[in-house]
Design a protein with these regions (language model features):
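Extended ligand-binding regions for polar small-molecule ligands
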Residues: 18, 58-67, 127, 134, ...
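Ligand-binding clefts/hinges and TM-proximal coupling segments of bilobed small-molecule sensing domains
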Residues: 19-22, 148-164, 203-204, 234-269
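Extracytoplasmic small-molecule ligand-binding "clamshell" domains
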Residues: 19-97
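Bilobed "Venus flytrap"/periplasmic-binding protein-like clamshell domains
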Residues: 34-42, 51-67, 98-99, 118-171, ...
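A ligand-binding cleft/hinge motif common to bilobed small-molecule-binding domains
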Residues: 81-84, 97-106, 154, 177-178, ...
């Protein structure tokens, strides 16, 4: 199945951008799906120097598109740009570590989740000052634009961290490396990807405290498309593809990775 996923993704890059994105009622009416993914999250989605997107999210999107009988191509997005990609017709789906929330469900229709990640904390290797979420009080914590991870700490857990803004999690990691921040906190898959890439420069605290349910976002109201995507996600777990992809991209991180079908949100508001 890995060969199928890779070949679908490769073929998609030669097929252009898929034409009119806003004219169809549902993604099921399209011959080709344009999928927005991140471009700077190691293990999840990066764009190589040759312009090729690769990573877990990319492979998930390619698998889903293949199950729907669609060609697929990819465009880059940032956390703050995800809703706009769908609203403006620049993408048909968003697969970009997009945590499902009540507020976001008012703007997009979520299929999935395709993975339930646990929020954790990334620090510089050897730094023992942060062992759990409570230790973030008074610490400099990076806040990536468009992410709700820091809100879960400051508002949900009422921990008075000192937030330092950055545009992306890649920038957050740069700030962590330089010492401008003391921690980065978000879903463990995001943190694991950076930890593997940096080869020992950073460490995951391994004190998870909040679940992050990563959904596949569709244009608001596409219930039929959402239901079909959920069937594809179920197939991905039941045929072993999800387990293989998780091991492929994150096996070296040491994280305990779930290979069970996540409980879906439901496609209607």
């Amino acid at each position: 199945m890995r060969k199928l996923v890779s070949s679908v993704a490769a073929a998609s890059l030669l097929s252009g951008c898929g034409g009119d994105l806003a004219g169809a009622r549902s993604i099921l009416d399209k011959d080709e799906l344009v999928v927005a993914v991140k471009s700077d999250q190691p293990g999840l989605a990066v764009r190589t120097s040759g312009g090729v997107f690769q990573g877990f999210d990319v492979d998930v999107a390619a698998y889903v598109a293949a199950r729907l009988g669609k060609k697929v191509s990819f465009v880059a997005t940032t956390s703050e740009g995800r809703e706009a990609k769908l609203r403006e017709g620049a993408a048909d789906m968003v697969v970009a570590t997009y945590s499902i929330s009540a507020e976001r469900k008012r703007q997009v229709t979520f299929a999935g989740p395709y993975y339930v990640s646990r929020q954790d904390i990334l620090v510089r290797a050897g730094y023992g000052g942060i062992r759990n979420v409570r230790d973030l009080k008074g610490r400099r914590l990076c806040e990536a634009q468009g992410s709700i991870s820091t809100s879960r700490i400051v508002d949900g857990h009422r921990i008075a961290a000192v937030l330092v803004p950055a545009r992306t999690y890649g920038e957050c990691v740069d700030l962590l490396r330089s010492g401008a921040v003391e921690a980065v906190s978000t879903g463990d898959l995001i943190l694991a990807g950076f930890a593997v890439r940096e080869r020992g420069a950073f460490a995951i605290v391994n004190a998870p405290f909040t679940a992050e349910r990563y959904g596949i976002a569709l244009p608001l109201g596409d219930v039929e498309g959402c239901e079909q995507v959920n069937r594809a996600i179920t197939d991905m777990y039941q045929d072993g593809t999800a387990a293989r992809l998780l091991d492929k991209w994150f096996g070296a991180s040491g994280l305990q990775l779930s290979a069970f079908v996540p409980e879906f949100e439901g496609c209607t508001p």
